[in-house]
Amino acid sequence: MSVLKINQGNFESVKNSERPVLLDFYADWCGPCRMLSPVVDEIATEREDILVGKINVDEEEELAREFGVFSSPTLVVMKGGRVVSQSAGVRPKAQILAMLEG
């Protein structure tokens, strides 16, 4: 499945997804975000059971504030509309998958 671009307009439908949700809060100018992006894309392609979305913190400041995002990249895992895991900084694929399983 492809990565969804998340914004204020489509966030509620993403939040209420039946599937676990992986959110990648990023900025275009952020070097570590560019390093993490292919890993997130790979997870989206490999895992049909997970909804993967990216949120540009410069365009969606309100969503970033709502999640307490102060640094990029930040990964958030949601299940049943609730945050179950959150992590700032670049993470290896195995650690991201562990966040999703936790």
Predicted feature residues:
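Short pre-active-site segment immediately N-terminal to redox-active cysteine/selenocysteine motifs
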Residues: 18-19, 26-29, 71
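Conserved helix-turn-beta segment immediately C-terminal to the redox Cys motif
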Residues: 18-20, 37-55, 59-61
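Non-catalytic, surface beta->alpha helical segment in thiol-disulfide oxidoreductase systems
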Residues: 76-102
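Conserved redox-active cysteine motifs that mediate thiol-disulfide chemistry
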Residues: 25-39
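A short beta-strand-turn-helix
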Residues: 3-20, 61
